[in-house]
Amino acid sequence: VGFKAGVKDYKLTYYTPEYETKDTDILAAFRVTPQPGVPAEEAGAAVAAESSTGTWTTVWTDGLTSLDRYKGRCYHIEPVAGEEDQFIAYVAYPLDLFEEGSVTNMFTSIVGNVFGFKALRALRLEDLRIPPSYIKTFQGPPHGIQVERDKLNKYGRPLLGCTIKPKLGLSAKNYGRAVYECLRGGLDFTKDDENVNSQPFMRWRDRFLFCAEAIYKAQAETGEIKGHYLNATAGTCEEMIKRAVFARELGVPIVMHDYLTGGFTANTSLAHYCRDNGLLLHIHRAMHAVIDRQKNHGMHFRVLAKALRLSGGDHIHAGTVVGKLEGEREITLGFVDLLRDDFVEKDRSRGIYFTQDWVSTPGVLPVASGGIHVWHMPALTEIFGDDSVLQFGGGTLGHPWGNAPGAVANRVALEACVRARNEGRDLAREGNEIIREASKWSLELAAACEVWKEIKFNWQAVDTI
């Protein structure tokens, strides 16, 4: 067929409702809001075209390749209930479009220029189905849930953490003191805040040294393995790895990375280093709400969570359902399952558009953090289960008697909830009573209960089905 210059509708090439998806295809579900007058089929086809092989006009070099082999295809369109001007477009991408083991390349195609396309008023990537054949090109999490439990020798309960506050301004020695007090009081982990890197008031090397001293002192006194998430995030990949190397030399168990601001290339490099050198990797999702908060534009966090499991991380922040940050229960539990489980069935009631098989990729521990305190402990234990990290920053350091009593209060509350659950009690219904009973024999918990008895964050979640 000879080359014919000009512009033709995307749907003539890229809308293929008869297409049967392959096991090796990457499947995407986009929420599309087209400009007025743009038909659904044309808008869906435009998304498929602009995120794969297409451009705005026909080009003669199309004849030098097999478009049928490489093009993305919009294979199904369905309306969004309650939204007249929105629909879900399902797009299938052949695996050959993507570099092996590169989240960066996958996202550059699927959520690249197409999000600025003029024919669309808004576009949101709701979910991805990543085929096993592509998953197997990634290392994934450095260690995973079971290996972490074995390293820490901690089983049968959620892990407890605390973000050191104030997040900025402390000297390294005072910072290390707070770490020691929290770990000595009964927490498993303490944490650098996401924006603690290497600032004039506290350079990274000083912080690492004082935190390592705190860890070893707390371990010696409690007989438990302890950790502090040392944030290795830096301005360059080379500097990031240098910090991780120093953490390994200190013998600490875990480092941390801000994976969205740091970038997927840097994160994958750090995850590989962590597996090779026995370090756990905690992931913070700073900047996620810029990408996932709007309901009709951007990318849902479940996609960012899947991308993290590919790129690599042993923990990731995943909302709390009950605290100060965004997170509706069923949707949150949907992507928590996508982080932890080996096989997750399609379930639209939880926002899961595709069945996902992780083919034994290690799981990631979800971290509940943000505005939570001892009264939330029963709900958090019931919602997240044992394979989670519950992190209380202000809920530890805000205790009226200090940091160590704050840690004691949280540990007592957690142990009480786990014991009550194991005895068959209903945490959702009897939670407050369980905490009150425990506070009778723990003065630290009683004081915490009194301070935070009136604190609630009663705003509606934006992210709903």
Swiss-Prot record:
The disulfide bond which can form in the large chain dimeric partners within the hexadecamer appears to be associated with oxidative stress and protein turnover. Its cofactor is Mg(2+). The modification N6-carboxylysine is found at K191. It catalyses: 2 (2R)-3-phosphoglycerate + 2 H(+) = D-ribulose 1,5-bisphosphate + CO2 + H2O; D-ribulose 1,5-bisphosphate + O2 = 2-phosphoglycolate + (2R)-3-phosphoglycerate + 2 H(+). It is an enzyme of class 4 (lyase). Substrate binds at N113, T163, K167, R285, H317, S369. It is found in: Plastid, Chloroplast. The modification N6,N6,N6-trimethyllysine is found at K4. Mg(2+) binds at K191, D193, E194. Keywords: Calvin cycle, Carbon dioxide fixation, Chloroplast, Disulfide bond, Lyase, Magnesium, Metal-binding, Methylation, Monooxygenase, Oxidoreductase, Photorespiration, Photosynthesis, Plastid. One of its GO terms (cellular component) is chloroplast. InterPro entries: RuBisCO, RuBisCo_large_chain_AS, RuBisCO_lsu_C, RuBisCO_lsu_C_sf, RuBisCO_lsu_fd_N, RuBisCO_lsu_N_sf, RuBisCO_lsuI. RuBisCO catalyzes two reactions: the carboxylation of D-ribulose 1,5-bisphosphate, the primary event in carbon dioxide fixation, as well as the oxidative fragmentation of the pentose substrate in the photorespiration process. Both reactions occur simultaneously and in competition at the same active site. The basic functional RuBisCO is composed of a large chain homodimer in a 'head-to-tail' conformation. In form I RuBisCO this homodimer is arranged in a barrel-like tetramer with the small subunits forming a tetrameric 'cap' on each end of the 'barrel'. This is Ribulose bisphosphate carboxylase large chain. It comes from Securidaca diversifolia (Easter flower). The gene is rbcL.
